[in-house]
């Protein structure tokens, strides 16, 4: 079959891995889906490295090589979040000037021990530092507590529309904008980057669906467009947990050491999606998100991680 290129409609999709280790089969499957969603709809496909936090030496280079090995390409240079901190600080300044931020001195343990959130849903940040007096803040600074910066949310939930899940309403709380160590928080960085890069389609694992209303709400506060979302099922081990090294041959390099070629690994991924064993570009003509599996792909460890039926 000849390669098919959809008409360009503008906008972009993206894949945004963290260089904390090698990509496993679940990561590669999600990357393939993000690529197919974008290319089939005529969008550009961008690659962004979320390297604000833990970075393992050489991981980024291996990740890019693995994506190329299964036939994925991208438009423009790879963007690294570590080079974009001025953008995040500008967004924080905008929220601060609007009176929508406050300092938070809570430890993670203190937050977990809070039974309820008085101004938000169960499990949300309890608002301990929301209305501290100047004296309270001075006391906490004197104790040497590092201050994170939180959003002063003005609502408790927000609704988004997901291409696979439909309308989804989830909690919104006072998310962290800047961590206590000074690093921009994930929820802020991803919102700023998607808007700055013209990303109007976000395809990622459905474990991130619960955090999406927070991100969409934050985008609206910053006057930024909310992208279209599609949260896809994860790849799980036989116990229903996310893949890890202990599950066997979970990376492309592992599979190659076990005797499989990148093309065979790609065929494994496409088969799990109900797609034929073809190069990615040859899948575009017949790609239909409505026909994708809606359940996780369950793998068993027999040395090569062959797929098994979902329970």
UniProtKB/Swiss-Prot annotation:
Positions bound to L-glutamate: 14-18, 50, 186, 204
Superkingdom per UniProt: Bacteria
InterPro entries: aa-tRNA-synth_I_CS (IPR001412), Glu-Q_tRNA(Asp)_Synthase (IPR022380), Glu/Gln-tRNA-synth (IPR000924), Glu/Gln-tRNA-synth_Ib_cat-dom (IPR020058), GluQ/Sye (IPR049940), Rossmann-like_a/b/a_fold (IPR014729)
Any GO BP: glutamyl-tRNA aminoacylation
Motif segment ('KMSKS' region): 242-246
UniProt keyword terms in alphabetical order: Aminoacyl-tRNA synthetase, ATP-binding, Ligase, Metal-binding, Nucleotide-binding, Zinc
Binding site for Zn(2+): 104, 106, 125, 129
Free-text cofactor note: Binds 1 zinc ion per subunit.
Binding residues annotated for ATP, in chain numbering: 245
Family from the record: Belongs to the class-I aminoacyl-tRNA synthetase family. GluQ subfamily.
Protein purpose: Catalyzes the tRNA-independent activation of glutamate in presence of ATP and the subsequent transfer of glutamate onto a tRNA(Asp). Glutamate is transferred on the 2-amino-5-(4,5-dihydroxy-2-cyclopenten-1-yl) moiety of the queuosine in the wobble position of the QUC anticodon.
Name listed for the protein in its UniProt record: Glutamyl-Q tRNA(Asp) synthetase
Species the sequence originates in: Nocardia farcinica (strain IFM 10152)
